Amino acid sequence: MFKGSMPALVTPMKDGAVDFATLEALVEWQIAEGSHGLVPVGTTGESPTLSHEEHEAVVAKVIEVAAGRVPVIAGAGSNNTVEAVRFVRHAKDAGADGALVVTPYYNKPTQGGMIAHYTALAEAADIPIVIYNIPGRSVVDMTPATMAALAALPTIVGVKDATGDLARVSQTRMACGPEFIQLSGEDATALGFNAHGGVGCISVTANVAPALCAQFQEATLAGDFATALALQDKLMPLHEAIFVEPGLVGAKYALSLLGKCSEDVRLPLLGLSDGTKVLIKDAMIHAGILG
């Protein structure tokens, strides 16, 4: 259903507004470069600073432009269950292939609260739901046992795991079964993630180096870890440089060097420091994507 390299798409901005023409061009470029799916309006898509109307318009535009050529997993998370229900229903109505739903952040629900939250979403719309577990941002960590309870629901199909804990992949497979889709949420450890049984990555770096990230994923899924390791070595400096400051800011700067997108981000995020810009430019040259 979902596998391979799936960029967590940036949301282009121009003069403070969403730049839909550039978004359309980015989607076309991503598909032409070999990305296996698209994930709009996650954290990298600046979801916290988009209005509901902008959020839904971005999702609809990506689905429209993709036109069924690759799956679209729409960002639909919130720490307010009622709001998440709205986003999941919109994803379904807009024609998304799935919805990515982050664990509720800031209000710190219990494991039981998370089960109730995702159960409400599964009951609200008949659409495949991918759990997004990122305790570094949400301050809650969904356990494999909780995930197994949710995996029993027919529309809870997988997880984007950004714990950085490679042993978790095996633990989740043991708890949820081999059909439960596991996607990495951390570029730097995606090689090991797939070696443990993962099947893809929802990637920030793929915004900037989509062809290399797609080739990397294809190599790991074919069991060709020699090729994957060579690609990892090309990409690793870029993985690291993009995240010296907030990853979406780094990705937008890198895209600006490629002429694909402006650097514009919304407050409270700021543009990159000069030192980080140098690191990203050097990493792009190392990867062979910038002359």
From Swiss-Prot:
One of its GO terms (biological process) is lysine biosynthetic process via diaminopimelate. It holds the Pfam family DHDPS. The record marks T43, Y106 as: Part of a proton relay during catalysis. One of its GO terms (molecular function) is 4-hydroxy-tetrahydrodipicolinate synthase activity. Pathway: Amino-acid biosynthesis; L-lysine biosynthesis via DAP pathway; (S)-tetrahydrodipicolinate from L-aspartate: step 3/4. The active site is at Y132 (proton donor/acceptor), K160 (schiff-base intermediate with substrate). It is an enzyme of class 4 (lyase). The keyword Phosphoprotein does not apply. It is found in: Cytoplasm. Keywords: Amino-acid biosynthesis, Cytoplasm, Diaminopimelate biosynthesis, Lyase, Lysine biosynthesis, Schiff base. Pyruvate binds at T44, I202. It catalyses: L-aspartate 4-semialdehyde + pyruvate = (2S,4S)-4-hydroxy-2,3,4,5-tetrahydrodipicolinate + H2O + H(+). One of its GO terms (cellular component) is cytosol. SMART domains: DHDPS (SM01130). The keyword Cytoplasm applies. Its EC number is 4.3.3.7. Homotetramer; dimer of dimers. Belongs to the DapA family. Catalyzes the condensation of (S)-aspartate-beta-semialdehyde [(S)-ASA] and pyruvate to 4-hydroxy-tetrahydrodipicolinate (HTPA). This is 4-hydroxy-tetrahydrodipicolinate synthase. It comes from Dinoroseobacter shibae (strain DSM 16493 / NCIMB 14021 / DFL 12).
